[in-house]
């Protein structure tokens, strides 16, 4: 089960990293934004992450970690997809969806970290985190290398839409993998 969680996490990272790299271009090209608006989007995304982390820390939802992770994947994917199909006049909506993306990230990263901490023996935890970080970065690097070419070929907004769909599908798929959904029931 934990192996599948890590595979899903690597896939999500593969599709999210190009979006992170393209945020400034999306603002400049699709929304004819200014340097100030590029900064604003980055700020709003970061504020969303901060607020999401605070909310997760205060709220402490009574939802299974894998469910929270999968739901956050779907929310992130939907908000990225919608950002990709917004008309150029919808900068304010784009800014709002940037906050939503940021808000959803702690609801993935927090439960993922906690899940690893509860399922892996403490003496191996550092090595597992190091290995996972290295493994998840490899496909991200490949995705980032191809991002510029793909964005030039099909447009930045289309990359957002396609990556958003891929994230939604990956997050939804995780709900149908029994070893993931039963992971917290195994004790």
Positions of predicted regions on the chain:
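Juxtamembrane cytosolic amphipathic helices that cap and anchor the N-termini
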Residues: 1-12, 90
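C-terminal transmembrane bundle of multi-pass solute transporters/carriers
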Residues: 2, 17, 23-187
């Amino acid at each position: 089960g934990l192996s599948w969680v890590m595979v899903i996490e690597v896939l999500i990272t593969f599709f999210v990293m190009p979006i992170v790299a393209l945020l400034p271009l999306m603002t400049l090209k699709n929304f004819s934004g200014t340097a100030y608006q590029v900064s604003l989007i980055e700020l709003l995304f970061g504020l969303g992450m901060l607020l999401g982390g605070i909310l997760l820390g205060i709220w402490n939802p009574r939802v299974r970690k894998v469910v929270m992770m999968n739901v956050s994947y779907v929310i992130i994917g939907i908000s990225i997809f919608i950002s990709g199909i917004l008309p150029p006049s919808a900068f304010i909506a784009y800014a709002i969806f940037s906050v939503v993306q940021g808000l959803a990230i702690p609801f993935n990263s927090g439960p993922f970290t906690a899940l690893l901490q509860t399922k892996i023996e403490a003496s191996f935890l550092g090595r597992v985190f190091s290995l996972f970080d290295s493994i998840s970065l490899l496909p991200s690097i490949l995705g980032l290398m191809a991002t510029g070419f793909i964005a030039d070929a099909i447009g930045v907004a289309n990359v957002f839409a396609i990556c958003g769909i891929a994230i939604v599908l990956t997050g939804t798929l995780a709900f149908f993998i029994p070893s993931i959904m039963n992971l917290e029931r195994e004790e």
